[in-house]
Amino acid sequence: MPRKGRVPRREILPDAKYNSIIVHKLINKVMKDGKKSTAEYIVYTALERVAEKLNLSPVEVLEKALENVKPVWEVRPRRVGGATYQVPVEVEEHRRESLGIKWLVDAARERARHRGSYTMEERLAAEIMDAIENKGAAVKKKEDTHRMAEANKVFAHFKW
């Protein structure tokens, strides 16, 4: 634990094309091995494909998709007298966003293993479309998390 208080959060700068912090976070999550220009190409192409189909701006598309993927509740383990309980807690806003983006990207990467091999732009675009329509692996992950929190609601009094 730091002795000098909390470390301040780093300020994230918006991306160059859409001037959006959320798009920049998505680019950083898609990026592998420091290849940011490749990640930017993947994200911009995916967003433009979905935006074209829905006649919306790419940033609106991403915000709609994230709204359906962000979790409100999650469970955290809490040890009480030798037993570990899964205690449901509300997710803070910055963590909601981070988890939503992470689940979108993970679900897009998983698509390759199940449904033939096609490009990451296509997989990300398909996952964003599914998220907007409230289906797909990322939305399922959110629903599973909420179901787990609902099932363990009896341990809510162990909140810390």
Curated annotation (Swiss-Prot):
Family: Belongs to the universal ribosomal protein uS7 family.
Annotated keywords: Ribonucleoprotein, Ribosomal protein, RNA-binding, rRNA-binding, tRNA-binding
SUPFAM superfamilies associated with the record: Ribosomal protein S7 (SSF47973)
Protein name: Small ribosomal subunit protein uS7
GO cellular component: small ribosomal subunit
InterPro entries reported for this sequence: Ribosomal_uS7, Ribosomal_uS7_bac/org-type, Ribosomal_uS7_CS, Ribosomal_uS7_dom, Ribosomal_uS7_dom_sf
Organism for this UniProt entry: Hydrogenobaculum sp. (strain Y04AAS1)
GO MF term set: rRNA binding; structural constituent of ribosome; tRNA binding
Pfam families: Ribosomal_S7 (PF00177)
GO terms of biological process kind: translation
CDD domains associated with the record: uS7_Bacteria
Function statement: One of the primary rRNA binding proteins, it binds directly to 16S rRNA where it nucleates assembly of the head domain of the 30S subunit. Is located at the subunit interface close to the decoding center, probably blocks exit of the E-site tRNA.
Signal peptide limits: none
Assembly and binders: Part of the 30S ribosomal subunit. Contacts proteins S9 and S11.
Top-rank taxon: Bacteria
